[in-house]
């Protein structure tokens, strides 16, 4: 390690937080080789936590993430040249049989939240580097680190942002430093594994017992684990970390969950290893607010209990009272003693029976390999149940027999048409109800209650239908989308399969609807190009109808007229959906736009516009968001909900957008760009109609949305709704809807960053923005949600009276008296009351070409 005086290129500060507990040996070796003095933030303490508490954008994020704020503050106080905390989407894959090697959304992108919310970074001009880096790809990593440190950082310094010392960094130096860092990282992990093997050998030789304290790397922080390793050791156990033994065996696959997070792969492997040993048991550490652990805890529990092992989980957060933990550990000790007594009795009985010739010796288990150890050979001591989970495929015969395919509701306007597209293609698709409070109760019965609200609602919809008696379960299947990303949504399918088995229906096929290969095979369910095209038109039409309905309904001259017009055109669209093409889709849209554009309205544009963004299901599903659009309209406002299609375009655009930061396949990029161009071609005629209309606007293209997002964060933030959520808020502000409800499931991991964490920066860039984040889950108080929304709306109305954030280019009537033709600027507006002089001036200035007689 170089001291600051020995380092020709200055000092780099690294926070002792999150994935640095995994990656620090790599970064220490890398920067030391380049000639930097590496300064690690001080050890965590309550003081560390308190130092960062004012900058935390979300109180429901996990304790390890909260702690990182204090570590950055510690480095700011130490005046290092720059702070290094890269965003790492993928770890290096340790188990080639695992589905992927993601970091969780918080570990991946929380440095973004730190940069946007710690005021000292901006106020003191701190150089805080948090680039996305392809940590999993050695070649791409060399390219990216050279760009960040030798090109971008120098340019920033020349612009007055940061300070660069010493000689210019060359590409060959970066390459050599990366090679050295890979070697140091490999030695670090080999040392941990060797120490784990030696400790296990000691346990074996001395007749001891070990506890695998399984969690994530940052659970090794004594402040985060609250000295639990020492507590367990005080009871006479040897304590192992999950990564010290996970290399010794791999789980049999496929396991039930989609194994796509690298730290989790270790949990499943070490749980499997524990089931093969009499001298090991496992305690899992779970941080409060870690939604992914709702998946891992269930899976680890299944692996252990299937083999007769005891599962124990300890939830930890900032509260350090270990009384409950001591009780759980003592309970585990008592249970282990009981098990040991039973094993001894069984062994004694078996020995006596064998001596009498009444029983044959037990044959060695075929599931007892010698493990891949470097120093020792560890044999399985006990039989272990298979971890493989059988999948039931949806066959062509099932399709031909007309199986009912249950599809959970997400976006009622759009899915109403998508259902007809699939039915026209020969699938007996049954769309489940959109108003289904019983589904919430069913979900809570079958799903770990720490999982996110959409997971509960999706699983609950299906299980309520399964248990309703409405369907012939011998001819029923389920379809669910899988994104393949690092959000929990990819594991909806695992939750549904678990619920079906627990309800006694493991034979029901669960079909994966996904654009990526995730190990699912359903020969009876194929998405053809024709079906895909019609589905896109269905979503496009849903977006158009949603915009027009929400735009007109608050001002309809005749109550119910907007809904009646909506139902008329939706009925026509349902009949047309299985035959949708560019011609008939465009013709139907032309007629619908003309009808909505000319329907009689009263006081058009006199109500504040309130945008609705957020996690995709909560944003669109009325049950999930407690009918938020109805609430907005009931409070005298106009709802603006960005369309559904953009979510799919966002997903398709990521390969192109992340190529410089993370690298991506040229073939994938070309394919996705071709699809985006095709969709743009499909919707261009209708966009032109919307632009020519008096009341409506065409949505921005996805490339424009990405550029908006870049003003706040990296477009590599692409887990969940990712950068699109931020872009939608910016777009709403730009189009006269600065009042925004950010709907999100309680503890939605991506939304901690791309939702809650960006609000402060949006307010800084756009002082007129009026944003409220509202959490939704089964236990959330609807009264609390309503109070937060009503408070935001009261501010919206006050701002509208003052002319703040008011921008409606296409609304003439609001500013023109229909009788005299004089500018009224909201006088006697039913929503706002008399207008101020400031409002009159503001409206006159902003309306521009929108004023028509």
What kind of feature is each model-predicted range?
Residues 1-853:
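An N-terminal assembly and electron-transfer interface module characteristic of large anaerobic redox
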